Amino acid sequence: MRQLLIIHFLFILFPIAAMSQETKVKLTEKVYITFPEKPDVRNMQEIASVYSLRLADSTANFNVVVQNLGKNGLTEEQIETAQLEPAFWEQLESSFIAQLGNETTVLSKEKKNISGKDVLILELSTERNGKKMELKSYIFIDSLYSINIVHSKRAAGASLDLRDKFFNSLKIVE
């Protein structure tokens, strides 16, 4: 009976412990996102920061790249002006797709306004090491920073609810 009681409490506490692993990350002064677990962080000499998380069951990856465009000599005004041109968004899309390789197919794309920011939303299919992957990405600019938020579905068992929760956790403070 006592063992049964202990096992019962473990089943009650386990979901609570799992929920508490969520980690809110400040990407810029005005942009936050919550990862399902604590991500690995790499800062590359103030040029870029990379946040990455691979789920323990390897069904999905969650990644965010924050690139400081000011380090490329661009000003905030130049970036704001460039965003007004469709060619700017086309270049963001094509450069991201080029990084993924020739096997990449665009499943859907849309430009959406989230908290006053134009966000390019891409859903892609690609192949890596003979395995098919599906990706969803939000690409946008905040001040001098290019932000690319990516979820990679690596296996059929990947939770779409977890993916949607990740993207829905994006907070942009105006």
Task: Locate the predicted segments by residue.
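Bacterial Sec-dependent N-terminal signal peptides
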Residues: 1-23
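Sec-dependent signal peptide cleavage junction
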Residues: 18-32, 75-80, 173
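Surface-exposed amphipathic alpha-helical segments
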Residues: 21, 27, 37-39, 143-174
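Short secondary-structure junctions
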Residues: 23-24, 34-44, 96-112, 171-173
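A structural detector for beta-sheet-dominated domains
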Residues: 26-28, 34-36, 42, 54-56, ...
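Stable alpha-helical elements in mature extracytoplasmic
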Residues: 31, 35, 84, 88, ...
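Conserved polar/disulfide-associated segments of primarily extracytoplasmic proteins
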Residues: 47-134
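A short, solvent-exposed beta-edge/loop patch
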Residues: 135-145
